Design a protein with these regions (language model features):
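C-terminal beta-signal and adjacent terminal beta-strands/loops
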Residues: 4, 573, 650-655, 678-750
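Short, acidic, small-residue-rich periplasmic hinge/interaction motif at the N-terminus
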Residues: 18-61, 100, 515, 519
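Extracytoplasmic beta-strand/coil segments of soluble accessory domains associated
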Residues: 69-111, 133
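Short acidic/polar hinge/loop motifs at secondary-structure boundaries
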Residues: 111-139, 158, 255
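Transmembrane beta-barrel wall of Gram-negative outer-membrane proteins
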Residues: 174-205, 210-247, 283, 288-299, ...
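Face-selective signature of the C-terminal outer-membrane beta-barrel domain
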Residues: 282-439, 460-464, 472, 514-520, ...
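Membrane-embedded beta-barrel scaffold of Gram-negative outer-membrane proteins
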Residues: 295, 301-307, 462, 468-474, ...
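Gram-negative outer-membrane beta-barrel transporters
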Residues: 520-524, 542-658, 747
Length: 750
């Protein structure tokens, strides 16, 4: 713990693009502009990249307790999914077809992606949106950031800005599937013109759409610090606790027709009936951040900070008909039912800094990051039928250390107010050591070191004040995750890091009423890691490098704002009475050559490796990469304070694997959501009250947004002593999303 506290003194990003970093409030207090904390990991207006900014106002519009991915669903090239089917619990987001392991996520510039799995588990930070000030989505490699390379995109989340005045806020929402959410927050404003203290807490419960997919989630957010005209110092402590009944196995294809909410979790694939009641995932995560932003002389700005992220938890599962000797080698072999817990304990700590110079058309940043992850993986058997077991014994035990270091330099140079030159160079080192035994008692000892050079360059031309064109090139490198490394080790293979060349070119029309953007991208992968159907000796899936694959497409997004002329009815009818927001992506996502492995099993379900079938596929589609993603939002404001929005989403078919097999796919789907919000002033009783209702999937379309597939062949003796084969047989599993459902709530600000 001493080491953790020692490292709680250094972490964030670079500063504003001008010398103005503070604003005066109505009370004449001066408060530092909080957005400078995230600028080093964000694209600026002159950056030659594709990005989208989502304000706190936009985030709050639909915030009734669903996870953050669902509040970003209408942004360009984004597809979301929910294991429980209703947006609460385990949720996921894909950008340009890339899942969360390939999307870099930062909170105030601090990496959120798990250092080993590289995934992002939004369930660990429930109701994060209530504490968010803004989010920027960059698509493609984007600018240099902290943590793993962005292969699909990056999400930069800024937590809430300190308020200069005291405030209080409370919200409650309820909805389908016994969903309930309560949130309360309060702040002191600036005390003695400089000091502040703010806090909030949330509680969310839901039964979920899928059977037993219940969630019980808690979160909190506290920040305190000092703000002046040239300095901001903040200490943040936030985190969450989650207990969710497992729903990550999906629903078998045949069950979709008769019982689309069937959940196999807790039944051990049908061997346990009734289902085990505590087949749950239990995890807690705590974030500590100490952030400093300081305006220096000579047009310099400094950001620095320290962080520690602590995680601890397990998932519990029932296993039927299991040999107890596999867990306790001192016991005689016997088949019994048991309950086991698979544990993870970890800490991730370190710091980052950025020094920014902005003057006379030059905007330059020099920064760096260091983080060390320490993790423990172990398992326990807490109960076995008719067998006395040692509940504290670890039947497997492993430990990991991962060091992540980067240093970068970035410069934007604006020449003659017309041309903006962009150069960004990053060096990143990753060292990973892991050893012990895994869940199948396999022994491992792996040491890996990777060195990555990630250059980026681009050009933005301002044809005039409204018309901008740009082009850029970026190189990204990404290390394999823990599963990739271990499965390669167990199968005596070499797993290579992935590399991607990202070329982007676009046009921006900066009109206040009709903004528009068009972006072309070509993402060329070398050694992309993909699932092949191949398994280790104990049945774990193996990802392998495919030499050549690519994604290319065009993204369109924009808005139309129709304003009422004149101000005769200003107190009754808002000026901006109707808006249309849209995005459209059309893409090709291809693997040039892909080898699929289909295994054969005998009558005892033992694998017969000599009968493995290998099929080579050419020019196939990359899994989970729809060629069309489109969204359309219509927003009407008929009277002041009232907003009515109709959000429409359409996604074309996606394949569950990389074979382009029409029998292994997600069908095209679309849905429409209707949200209504009405805000009224409270006058002497408070600031305002907002009533909100969100109707999801109003046309009750039944669809699936995620899934997985595997194929097997079966061998049998036909009596001649020769094994005959039957198959292959394909098994598809899907994650069904809820039909029509609703959430409604009230928010009061004091």
């Amino acid at each position: 713990m001493k080491k953790v506290l020692f490292f709680l003194l250094l972490a964030n990003n670079a500063l504003a693009q001008t010398d103005s970093v503070s604003v005066k409030t109505d009370s004449n207090n001066v408060i530092f502009k909080d957005e400078v904390i995230v600028n080093a990991t964000r694209a600026t207006e002159n950056a030659p990249t594709a990005y989208q900014f989502i304000s706190k106002k936009e985030l709050n519009k639909n915030n009734l307790g669903q996870d953050l991915p669902f509040l970003l669903d209408n942004t360009a090239s984004v597809v979301t999914t929910s294991d429980a089917g209703a947006g609460i619990g385990y949720t996921g987001i894909r950008i340009r077809g890339s899942d969360a392991t390939r999307v870099n996520v930062t909170l105030n510039g601090i990496p959120v992606n798990d250092a080993e799995s590289q995934g992002v588990f939004w369930v660990n930070t429930p109701d994060l949106v209530s504490s968010a000030q803004s989010i920027q989505i960059q698509r493609g490699v984007g600018s240099s950031t902290n943590g793993g390379s962005a292969f699909g995109g990056s999400l930069s989340v800024q937590t809430q800005t300190p308020s200069a005045t005291p405030f209080g806020e409370a919200s409650v929402s309820v909805g389908s599937f016994k969903t309930f959410r309560a949130n309360a927050k309060a702040g002191t404003g600036l005390i003695k013109k400089h000091f502040f203290l703010e806090g909030s807490g949330s509680w969310i419960v839901s039964d979920g759409y899928v059977d037993r997919a219940a969630s019980n989630l808690q979160s909190w957010f506290f920040q305190t610090g000092y703000s002046s005209e040239k300095t901001l110092l903040k200490l943040l402590y936030f985190g969450g606790r989650e207990k969710t009944y497992q729903s990550w196995y999906g629903v078998w294809e045949d069950s979709l027709k008769t019982n689309r909410t069937y959940n196999v979790a807790g039944t051990d694939y049908g061997y346990k009936n009734p289902p085990y009641p505590n087949q749950t995932d239990n995890y807690g995560q705590d974030y500590l951040q100490l952030l400093l932003a300081r305006q220096l002389p000579a047009h310099l700005h400094l950001n620095a900070g320290l962080f520690a992220t602590l995680g601890r938890g397990y998932y519990e599962e029932y296993k039927a008909g299991t040999n107890i000797q596999n867990y306790f080698d001192y016991l005689p072999a016997a088949y019994t039912d048991l309950v086991r817990q698979l544990w993870l304990r970890n800490v991730f700590y370190g710091g980052n800094f950025a020094l920014n110079y902005a003057h006379s058309g030059v905007d330059a940043t020099f920064g760096g990051f260091f983080g060390q992850y320490r993790g423990k993986h172990f398992g326990k058997v807490i109960w076995a039928q008719d067998v006395a077991v040692d509940k504290d014994k670890h039947y497997y035990d492993g430990s990991s250390v991962k060091n992540d270091f980067n240093i970068y330099a970035r410069v934007n140079y604006e020449a003659l107010d017309i041309v903006n030159f962009y150069l960004d160079v990053q060096y990143r080192y990753v060292g990973y050591n892991t050893s012990g035994t895994d869940n199948n008692q396999q022994v491992y000892d792996v040491k890996k070191n990777w060195h990555f050079f990630n250059p980026k360059a681009g050009l933005l031309i301002k044809i005039d004040a409204k018309h901008h064109v740009y082009a850029s090139y970026a190189l990204g490198n990404r290390e394999p995750n823990r599963d990739d490394v271990l499965q390669a080790y167990f199968s005596s293979r070499t797993v290579k890091p992935e590399m991607m060349d990202d070329v982007e070119a676009g046009y921006k029309f900066l009109h206040p009423k009709f903004p528009f953007g068009a972006n072309f991208y070509f993402m060329n992968y070398n050694n992309q890691l993909v699932l092949t159907g191949r398994l280790t000796d104990v049945g774990n899936p193996i990802k392998e490098n495919v030499k050549k694959s690519f994604r290319t497409g065009i993204e369109l997004n924009g808005s139309f704002h129709f304003a009422r002329k004149g101000n005769k009815y200003e107190k009754i009818v808002p000026r901006d009475v109707f808006s249309i927001n849209y995005s459209f992506t059309y893409s090709f996502n291809k693997i040039k050559s892909f080898s699929e492995y289909i295994y054969t099993y005998d009558e005892n379900y033992e694998r017969v490796d000599t009968l493995t079938q290998v099929i080579t596929h050419k020019n196939t589609d990359i899994a989970f990469s729809p060629s069309i993603i489109a969204s359309l939002e219509l927003v009407a404001r008929p009277v002041k304070g009232l907003s009515i929005g109709l959000q429409n989403k359409a996604v074309s078919k996606q394949y569950l694997d990389n074979t382009s097999n029409e029998h292994r796919k997600l069908k095209p789907f679309y849905y429409s959501n209707l949200n209504v919000a009405y805000t009224l002033p409270l006058n002497k009783y408070g600031k305002e009250i907002t009533l909100k209702v969100l109707f999801n999937n109003i046309f009750n379309h039944l669809y699936e947004s995620n899934g997985y597939t595997f194929s097997e062949r079966y061998a049998f003796d036909d009596g001649s002593g020769t094994l005959q084969t039957d198959g292959p047989y394909t098994y598809n599993y899907y994650y069904p999303q809820a039909g029509f459902n609703f959430l409604t709530g009230v928010n009061v600000r004091f």
